């Protein structure tokens, strides 16, 4: 039993000793230093310029490229204490350009080379002083071939017996340079891609101009659009915003023209939705203005170095328009929710508060939009697609506060609407009321969930901003290791979540178009409007009827009849043209409908069909 323990102990000692012996690269060699690059002045900090170790799978040229990148990052985001210490540069240069010892076999004339590695404590002290995270560069990393520490505590051991040197445990002390007064003038204008250099003497003033510096001591600025996504993904988001803005503008404009301009009898219901649709139109128009100017990329200035701010007219104008009418839309949407509940609960009792509510809503919207205008706080939202209110305190006070309050109140009204409908259906056993209210309910609910998402998205991003900024180190690591740094991204909201946010701020006109604009009443308004009742349209109709009546038929009698009909029709039309201007009665309505509709189409609009539907609750008949 004792002998077994002795054998195990011997094997353990042998294994430990074998693990401390570093392998020798037979193709490794000692080379003379090839010289500094403009970004990496290592000649001041290397211990021996005549003996640099180069392994079989490395070159000094590749090492200098890596050093250029690290010197660039050091100049861009390094702390002043880190950049002013010569030990930082001695350590950095010696990691990628280690010292070298060589041995020659006198019999075979073969020369071998072994590196002089940086000491672990030196590496650890420098990375700690410079604030380098371990996942970015770790002094605990091991060499891939041997599995031994890349930075030994004291020395490295080599077995040189096979190279006629005769020492099986040859030791090379690790290199632990000391700080001295050697100074280095880094190229302060160099910034590693994709950062931009901006010569700044006042970071605070330049921040107000739209620049975002990576640190207080650096003149390197964050690129725009912010590398949350690749350029291709940003283009997809920009195209989504442009497309929805155009569609929403035309959808809301159609509703305004139909129910406010062409409509011969505008009801209070039309006016209520008109104020909301008008606000949506102007919100969407701000996106169209941006689209015409070149899309969201037009808000990015100086080749991507800065974002648009208040002093840029395109930004301040579109930001003001969006804020003004976004608040307006929120307030009128809240009124629509209250109006819907009132109509469901009281049915025939009118709600006459528009004349008070409208001026109050416009006043609130104007004040909440002028405040950021007066304080010059409209600027592009970094990592987004439009200009809007700057500073969290103003955003929360002038937008998200009112939005949160409105959502709270509207949630109550939506619940009350559902409850009232439930009571009516339960009392009558009929679901007709639900059919009557389905479109208004959908309109309220769809917009409600859009507002809720905007509210939640903003506060989620604010609460997780540290996670985004905390991934900047990983971003720089990617730029160093990637063949295409433009593919590197900073951690942040997923592209799907930002895409849905863009959808929510641009979709309202499309929602309203499908829920309000595609119905029989809208078609009748257009059919009887001046758009289809003017001399030009009348002339086209006459020509079309003439061509139709003069076309060949299967029998001569039919042709004669057609000709007679044409003569009569033309005679009647000419007679009426001489006596009066064309009106609906002078035209053949068959061009638009199979049936001749009466003027009763212009009776008071009754969107809830109160006149045509009797609702019985218990023994009471409500009309």
From Swiss-Prot:
InterPro entries membership: Frizzled_dom_sf, GPCR_Fz/Smo-like
All residue ranges annotated as the FZ domain in the record: 25-163
Chain residue ranges for the region called Disordered: 552-590
Glycosylated position list: 57, 106, 109, 154, 159, 169, 199, 239, 463
Disulfide bonds: 30-100, 42-93
Membrane topology, record value: Multi-pass membrane protein
GO cellular component: membrane
Annotated compartments: Membrane
Source superkingdom: Eukaryota
Keywords: Disulfide bond, Glycoprotein, Membrane, Receptor, Signal, Transmembrane, Transmembrane helix
Record bears the keyword Glycoprotein: yes
The keyword Glycoprotein belongs to this UniProt entry's keyword annotation: yes
Compositionally biased residues, Low complexity: 555-580
Signal sequence coordinates: 1-18
Residue ranges, Cytoplasmic side: 265-273, 339-354, 419-439, 516-623
Chief location: membrane
Transmembrane domains' residue ranges: 244-264, 274-294, 318-338, 355-375, 398-418, 440-460, 495-515
Extracellular side: 19-243, 295-317, 376-397, 461-494
Family the UniProt entry places it in: Belongs to the G-protein coupled receptor Fz/Smo family.
PANTHER family documented for this protein: FRIZZLED AND SMOOTHENED-LIKE PROTEIN L-RELATED (PTHR31787:SF10), G-PROTEIN-COUPLED RECEPTOR GPCR FAMILY PROTEIN (PTHR31787)
Name of the protein this chain belongs to: Frizzled and smoothened-like protein M
């Amino acid at each position: 039993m004792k002998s077994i323990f002795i054998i195990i102990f011997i094997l353990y000692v042998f294994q430990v000793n074998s693990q401390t012996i570093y392998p020798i690269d037979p193709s490794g060699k000692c080379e003379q230093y090839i010289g500094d690059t403009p970004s990496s002045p290592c000649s001041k900090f290397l211990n021996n310029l005549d003996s640099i170790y180069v392994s079989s799978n490395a070159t000094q040229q590749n090492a200098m490229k890596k050093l250029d990148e690290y010197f660039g990052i050091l100049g861009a985001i390094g702390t002043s204490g880190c950049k002013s210490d010569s030990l930082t540069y001695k350590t950095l240069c010696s990691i990628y350009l280690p010292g070298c010892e060589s041995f020659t076999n006198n019999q075979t004339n073969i020369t071998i080379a072994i590196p002089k590695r940086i000491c672990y404590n030196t590496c650890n002290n420098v990375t700690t002083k410079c604030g380098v995270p371990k996942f970015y560069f770790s002094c605990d990393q091991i060499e891939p071939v041997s599995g031994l520490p890349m930075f030994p505590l004291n020395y490295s051991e080599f077995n040189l017996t096979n190279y006629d040197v005769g020492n099986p445990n040859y030791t090379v002390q690790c290199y632990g340079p000391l700080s001295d007064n050697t100074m280095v003038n880094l190229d302060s204008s160099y910034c590693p891609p994709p950062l931009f250099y901006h010569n700044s003497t006042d970071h605070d003033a330049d921040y107000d101009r739209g620049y975002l510096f990576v640190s207080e001591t650096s003149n390197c600025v964050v690129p725009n659009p912010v590398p949350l996504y690749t350029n291709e993904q940003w283009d997809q988001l920009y195209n989504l915003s442009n497309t929805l803005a155009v569609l929403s503008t035309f959808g809301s404009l159609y509703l305004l023209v139909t129910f406010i301009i062409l409509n011969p009898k505008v009801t209070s219901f039309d006016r209520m939705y008109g104020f909301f649709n008008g606000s949506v139109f102007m919100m969407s128009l701000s996106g169209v203005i941006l689209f015409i100017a070149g899309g969201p990329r037009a808000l990015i200035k100086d080749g991507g170095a800065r974002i648009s701010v208040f002093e840029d007219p395109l930004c301040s104008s579109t930001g003001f328009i969006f804020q003004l009418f976004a608040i307006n839309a929120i307030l009128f949407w809240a009124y629509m929710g209250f109006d819907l509940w009132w109509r469901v609960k009281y049915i025939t009792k009118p709600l006459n508060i528009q004349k008070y509510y409208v001026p109050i809503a416009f006043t609130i919207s104007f004040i909440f939009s002028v405040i950021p205008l007066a304080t010059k706080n409209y600027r592009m939202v970094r990592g987004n697609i439009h200009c809007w209110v700057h500073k969290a305190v103003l955003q929360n006070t002038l937008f998200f506060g009112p939005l949160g309050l409105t959502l709270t109140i509207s949630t109550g009204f939506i619940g009350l609407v559902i409850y009232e409908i439930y009571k009516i259906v339960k009392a009558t056993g009929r679901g007709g009321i639900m059919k009557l209210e389905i479109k208004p309910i959908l309109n309220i609910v769809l917009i409600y969930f859009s507002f809720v998402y905007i509210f939640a998205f903003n506060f989620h991003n604010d609460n997780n901003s540290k996670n985004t900024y905390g991934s900047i180190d990983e971003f720089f690591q990617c730029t160093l290791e990637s063949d295409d740094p433009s593919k590197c991204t900073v951690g942040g909201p997923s592209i799907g979540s930002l895409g849905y946010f863009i959808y929510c701020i641009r979709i309202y006109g499309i929602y309203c178009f499908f829920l309000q604009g595609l119905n029989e009443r809208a078609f009748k308004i257009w059919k009887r409007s001046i758009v289809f009742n003017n001399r030009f349209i009348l002339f086209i109709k006459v020509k079309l009827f003439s061509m139709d009546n003069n076309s060949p038929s299967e029998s001569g009698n039919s042709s004669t009849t057609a000709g007679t009909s044409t003569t009569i029709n033309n005679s009647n039309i000419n007679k009426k043209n001489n006596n009066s201007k064309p009106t609906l009665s002078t035209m053949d309505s068959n061009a638009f409908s199979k049936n001749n509709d009466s003027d009763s189409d212009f009776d008071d609009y009754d969107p809830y069909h109160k006149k045509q539907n009797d609702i019985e609750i218990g023994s009471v008949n409500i009309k």
